[in-house]
């Protein structure tokens, strides 16, 4: 089975297994060597016209929190089935009104070889107080690049 076929199998299984009422559209499935991330779109809360950004933001926070709490037991059961079937841990997340929230996901150590100029960049981030260690500085840099790519998209 090719990588693409495996991805399609996982996506199809989750599409068939997830309750239809959970999400307003198709889920986004991301797979790497350790984890399957399932991110679904939630309905935007009805706030009425003329509400402040703070009220709208609080409504989105409430919608995300309610989904997380209300679906916890079923998500755990589905994740266990998927972990047994596909051999990967499952992480859950939602997207609501452009805000993405991941509930639980793996933090996996990644080994890399860096030359001195690259290590100096990490050391500068540590010295500036951006990170406590080279590892944390590297994670910070990856998050920064990811955020910039989202803005550019």
Where are these predicted regions, by residue range?
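N-proximal, solvent-exposed amphipathic alpha-helical segments enriched in charged/polar residues
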Residues: 1-27
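Generic alpha-helical secondary structure
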Residues: 3, 7, 11, 68-75, ...
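Short edge beta-strands and adjacent turn/loop segments
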Residues: 20-45
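A solvent-exposed, charged loop/short amphipathic helix patch at secondary-structure junctions
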Residues: 48-65
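A short amphipathic beta-strand at an alpha->beta junction
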Residues: 71-98
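Short Lys/Arg-rich basic patches
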Residues: 91-113
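Surface-exposed, Lys/Arg-rich phosphate-binding patches that contact polyanionic backbones
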Residues: 116-136
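Short, basic amphipathic alpha-helical segments that act as recognition/interaction helices
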Residues: 134-152
């Amino acid at each position: 089975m090719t990588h693409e076929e495996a991805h399609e199998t996982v996506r199809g299984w989750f599409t068939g297994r997830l309750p239809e009422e959970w999400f307003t559209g198709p889920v986004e499935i991301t797979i790497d060597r350790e984890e399957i991330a399932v991110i679904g779109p939630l309905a935007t809360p009805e706030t009425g016209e003329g509400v402040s950004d703070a009220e709208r933001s609080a409504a989105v926070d409430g919608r995300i929190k309610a989904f997380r709490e209300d679906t916890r037991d079923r998500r755990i059961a589905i994740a266990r089935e998927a972990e047994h079937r596909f051999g990967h841990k499952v992480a859950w997340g939602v997207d609501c009104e452009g805000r993405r929230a991941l509930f639980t996901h793996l933090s996996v150590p990644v080994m890399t070889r860096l030359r001195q100029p690259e290590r100096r960049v990490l050391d500068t981030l540590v010295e500036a107080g951006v990170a406590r260690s080279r590892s944390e500085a590297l994670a910070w840099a990856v998050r920064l690049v990811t955020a910039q790519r989202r803005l550019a998209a």
